[in-house]
Amino acid sequence: MATVQYYGTGRRKEAVARVRLMPGKGNIIINNRPLEEYFTLDTLKYTVKQPLILTETIDKFDVYAKVSGGGLTGQAGAVRLGIARALVKVDSELRPILKKAGFLTRDPRMKERRKYGLKKARKAPQFSKR
C-alpha cells in the first residue's frame, strides 16, 4: 500500500531543495540527517519550520528534503519554499495564508557578478588624485 506523498521544489540563491511531504508525526529529515543535526543554528531551524507552524501542520506531516548548492541560509530558504509549495498541494485553502506570509514568493535576489576593472561587484580599487 503506497502512502500519499506531496512534492514541492524550492530555490534560494544557488540552493535547490526537493521536498517530499508525507503524513506522519512531524519528523524533518534533510539529506538523510535530522533537522537539528543539519541546521545547528536556531534561526535556520525556525526558518524551515515556519510554513508548518503557520498552518498548524507541524505534527501532521513528515518532511523529507534533498538540498544541494549554496550555503546554509540559502538552503534553509529553499527548503522553506519547497515545504510551502507542497502544503498548497495538500490543501489549496492554505494558499492565502502562506501567500500573505510571503512563503510562496521566490526570493529573486542573487549574487551580483564581478565587473572587470573592479575588485568585487562594486568595490573599486583605491583612487588616488595625485
UniProtKB/Swiss-Prot annotation:
Entry-linked HAMAP family: Ribosomal_uS9_B
Species of origin: Thermoanaerobacter pseudethanolicus (strain ATCC 33223 / 39E)
InterPro entries from the UniProt entry: Ribosomal_Su5_D2-typ_SF, Ribosomal_uS9, Ribosomal_uS9_bac/plastid, Ribosomal_uS9_CS, Ribsml_uS5_D2-typ_fold_subgr
Chain segments carrying region Disordered: 111-130
Name of this chain's protein: Small ribosomal subunit protein uS9
GO biological process, one term: translation
A Pfam family the protein falls into: Ribosomal_S9
GO CC annotation: cytosolic small ribosomal subunit
GO molecular function, one term: structural constituent of ribosome
Family named by the database record: Belongs to the universal ribosomal protein uS9 family.
PROSITE patterns: RIBOSOMAL_S9 (PS00360)
Entry keywords, A to Z: Ribonucleoprotein, Ribosomal protein
Gene that this polypeptide is encoded by: rpsI
